Amino acid sequence: MKFSAKKEALADKLSLCSSIAEKRQTIPILSNVLLKANNGNLTIVATDLERQLSLIVSDCSISDDGETTVSARKLFELIRSVPDDTELNFEVIENQLEISALSFQADLAVLPVQDFPFVDLEDHNFNITLDGSKFGKVLESTSFAMASADVRYYLNGLLFETAQKKINMVATDGHRLAWGSYSHSEDLEDKKLIIPRSTALELSLIHI
């Protein structure tokens, strides 16, 4: 695998992935992000076995397709430390990811891709495209009412409902309730699901 990208194309996405990958993991591979270069894009994947986040970096140059996994925290801290507008070069050489620019070179240890545990989505075939701005506003106006450690686990999250051309979100901690809704451009399948609190908080960052 060999590719290049500027700091700005990677830093924000790695920050989001790191927030999932580095939660005091006891399984080493879960502290890593998967980097996959193919079809002219770089895909960054992080999981904690409950959540999986996949982000695509299109503003990059792929020389050789491939994939590897590397420490999310170390990679993010390294990229964050370089000056803005720095062009970074990445190449997997044996068991290391070599990262270089005009002024430095660093090597990070990698772990086998086959050990990376993808969340099985085959049984979850509900897909929806959301308007990030509208979704974010309703999420912000409702998520504050979620419970944080209630024994009634369903309160530690947010109800997400699709019905016809409406998207509704409801949160409550048993004492207060917040509801929000916005119109969707297409007719939607009627669905109800609970978004866990941790996922809702991550989504509040990603929608921006």
What residues fall within each predicted segment?
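Structural preference for solvent-exposed beta-strand-turn elements
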Residues: M1-I206
